Amino acid sequence: MHFGIPSLFYLYILFSIIMRIKCVITKNLKKTKKRTCSYIPHGNMEKGIILNYIEKPNPAYLKRGKNKNKNKNKKGDIYKLRNVEILLYANRYVHEGNENFSSTTKKLLLTPKVGNKMPEGKKPDWFHVAAPTVAKYNKLKDDIKKLNLHTVCEEAQCPNIGECWNIGTATIMLLGDTCTRGCKFCSIKTSSNPLPPDINEPFNTAKAICEWNIDYVVLTSVDRDDLPDGGASHFAKTVELVKFSRPDILIECLVSDFQGNIDSVRKLAFSGLDVYAHNIETVKRLQKYVRDKRANYDQSLFVLKTAKEINPQLYTKTSIMLGLGETKEEVIQTMYDARKNNIDVITFGQYLRPTKNHLSIVQYISPQMFEYYKEEGLKMGFKYIASGPLVRSSYKAGEYFIKNLVNQRNKDKKN
């Protein structure tokens, strides 16, 4: 086809117009995307200002670095923050503020994710723990190794291992060291087909516990969905052997949900244990982000409620990790749900990321907030609450729980 000079000129004009339109569209898209971000005044975190900037994003902001003074807004100096930062600030108000304005900030609810940016700055001072005393620590470690046992203290990289092992307390992990589930917060190794349970484990566990001469022991396990009863009979046999050797000892069993199998729950509930524990782990909204897809909030509550109904003499217990993006309102609601299902004891601790392949921490919760949750929980009627940054489900379980039981018993005698 032959084009004359006028035709080429018109094609050039048409091409220029198309490119111009494309540039305008691209620019508008970028501007639209930019305006969907939220901006807040740096150093001024008042509730009203946060909500104002969340609902009506202002494109005027103060860039970090050079040309600061050229980008001032009538409302004050504005810093452009990434979405994750603005959400973190807003969540702090929802989590720690006196007023509840979560309805306005529903779209800001945070979720944890592997690989997300961790909170800035060094780890708070309250996470510093003392080094273990060598003698007691080594003795306990040798006993566990000699009897081919596993502890959740080691497998889950618990920060309190030195403190607990120094006083001769360990949480023994039954059914091997490999879990059939893959929760995103847990460092225990996983497999869909782990080795069969060690038939000598119940006997070795009873032997170790008798040698340690302790008053309270916690038995836990990995999830074993590959076993017909989830490992309930193995648990029950261990409890029976320990109680036969030491009838006076108090036994807490921190178990899986057994996939909601009532027969498994019944088997364990009548084994002779004193405390039936199963962890909810997090608030309802965050379950799918934190736990394996086979676990869920309602099933966990059902298992604890069923255990109590089967054997009313049992104490039931659960635990929640904080710092995964939950709000204060959600934590309070979780406590209400636990009490509604007749759970006696609840513990709160700060989630700490085991490795970079696990969920990032969304927020460090202050000791004051842990104390607040404890006070609120006691008002709801929990028999005992352990709440603090380094508290874990099994952390000083005997010391806390026995002390509470004694106090409650003495109070009942007076009445």
Curated annotation (Swiss-Prot):
InterPro entries the record matches: Aldolase_TIM (IPR013785), Elp3/MiaA/NifB-like_rSAM (IPR006638), LIAS_N (IPR031691), Lipoyl_synth (IPR003698), rSAM (IPR007197)
Catalysed transformations (reactions): [[Fe-S] cluster scaffold protein carrying a second [4Fe-4S](2+) cluster] + N(6)-octanoyl-L-lysyl-[protein] + 2 oxidized [2Fe-2S]-[ferredoxin] + 2 S-adenosyl-L-methionine + 4 H(+) = [[Fe-S] cluster scaffold protein] + N(6)-[(R)-dihydrolipoyl]-L-lysyl-[protein] + 4 Fe(3+) + 2 hydrogen sulfide + 2 5'-deoxyadenosine + 2 L-methionine + 2 reduced [2Fe-2S]-[ferredoxin]
Binding site for [4Fe-4S] cluster 2: C179, C183, C186
UniProt xrefs under Gene3D superfamilies: Aldolase class I
UniProt signal peptide: 1-23
Biological or metabolic pathway of the protein: Protein modification; protein lipoylation via endogenous pathway; protein N(6)-(lipoyl)lysine from octanoyl-[acyl-carrier-protein]: step 2/2
GO CC annotation terms, alphabetical: apicoplast; mitochondrion
UniProt entry keywords in alphabetical sequence: 4Fe-4S, Apicoplast, Iron, Iron-sulfur, Metal-binding, Plastid, S-adenosyl-L-methionine, Signal, Transferase
Cofactor note: Binds 2 [4Fe-4S] clusters per subunit. One cluster is coordinated with 3 cysteines and an exchangeable S-adenosyl-L-methionine.
Cellular location(s): Plastid, Apicoplast
Swiss-Prot/TrEMBL cofactor(s): [4Fe-4S] cluster
Binding site for [4Fe-4S] cluster 1: C153, C158, C164, S394
Main location: plastid
Keyword Magnesium in record: no
Record bears the keyword Plastid: yes
EC number annotated for this UniProt entry: 2.8.1.8
Domain Radical SAM core, residue spans: 165-383
GO terms classed as biological process: lipoate biosynthetic process
GO molecular function: 4 iron, 4 sulfur cluster binding; lipoate synthase activity; metal ion binding
Entry's family note: Belongs to the radical SAM superfamily. Lipoyl synthase family.
Protein name listed in UniProt: Lipoyl synthase, apicoplast
Source organism: Plasmodium falciparum (isolate 3D7)
Lineage, broadest ranks: Eukaryota, Sar, Alveolata, Apicomplexa, Aconoidasida
